[in-house]
């Protein structure tokens, strides 16, 4: 009887962290037959992930080569999920990657992106690429991930932890994002503040992302169901989650310079999220003080959505 109980517990995993990385990792583990409990400090709709613009594209993530591989694995999944956009929140949508040339994607993504081409002058004034990429509506996708986890036999518990050793399972997976700074502790994890403005969509159907080489600012607009997301900012080591009115006005001005109709769009909301940046994603196996297996999966910067499935698959491998 004890042997049967031990065998059953050997299949148990506690995933700590309920953002897109934690949820996706929990789903992959549960669908591979593990008994998964997800512990989350706050509901998914209050995590940093819900503030994400949701465009699939590696942004502020290292190491680049691994991030690209994880992104391509995630692309495979998102392309499948886009067949059910109303349920999953995933759509394949065309738009412009501004200030990006074909040579920058030829080595890793060009073969996987049908229709990738140089943007025309009418589509973008500078050098840019016209691409069809996954755009994920996080307000739909996160609840869908939760339901998929529950359907696979997993459970979700609202629970804050101060020590990873509190997790009572043979395997613990740490997907705490910025929380890893204190929980591990890992001082290499730091916030990169992002602010967005949500407006009524004045009729824009394609996304655009453009980085200014001089200022380092990234300007983007992303059409999501019922709204248009405008961005963005990347403030290093900034902890405030209060929207800055001056920053918001500057975001609207930059977006309106590209599409004038944005200037008069009614503002619906202001959002702020703290990206969990690190000099390199930490995706590796370790041990807790009592010898139990610990898998770290955090530090994805501004690309958590982009690499979620690839990193989840690797984390599941490390947990086995």
UniProtKB/Swiss-Prot annotation:
Keywords: Cell wall, Cytoplasm, FAD, Flavoprotein, Oxidoreductase, Secreted. GO terms for biological process: D-amino acid catabolic process. One of its GO terms (cellular component) is cytoplasm. Its main location: cytoplasm. Its cofactor is FAD. InterPro entries: D-amino_acid_oxidase_CS, DAO, FAD-dep_OxRdtase. One of its GO terms (molecular function) is D-amino-acid oxidase activity. The keyword Oxidoreductase applies. Disruption phenotype: Knockout does not appear to have a significant effect on the assimilation and detoxification of D-valine. Its EC number is 1.4.3.3. The keyword Secreted applies. Gene3D superfamilies: D-Amino Acid Oxidase, subunit A, domain 2, NAD(P)-binding Rossmann-like Domain. Induction: Not induced when D-valine is added to the growth medium. D-proline binds at residues 220, 275, 302. D-serine binds at residues 220, 275, 302. It is found in: Cytoplasm; Secreted, Cell wall. It catalyses: a D-alpha-amino acid + O2 + H2O = a 2-oxocarboxylate + H2O2 + NH4(+); D-leucine + O2 + H2O = 4-methyl-2-oxopentanoate + H2O2 + NH4(+); D-valine + O2 + H2O = 3-methyl-2-oxobutanoate + H2O2 + NH4(+); D-isoleucine + O2 + H2O = (R)-3-methyl-2-oxopentanoate + H2O2 + NH4(+). FAD binds at residues 18-21, 47-49, 53-55, 161, 176, 275, 301-302, 304, 306. Catalyzes the oxidative deamination of D-amino acids with broad substrate specificity. Belongs to the DAMOX/DASOX family. PANTHER family: D-AMINO ACID OXIDASE, D-ASPARTATE OXIDASE. This is D-amino-acid oxidase. It comes from Streptomyces coelicolor (strain ATCC BAA-471 / A3(2) / M145). The gene is dao.
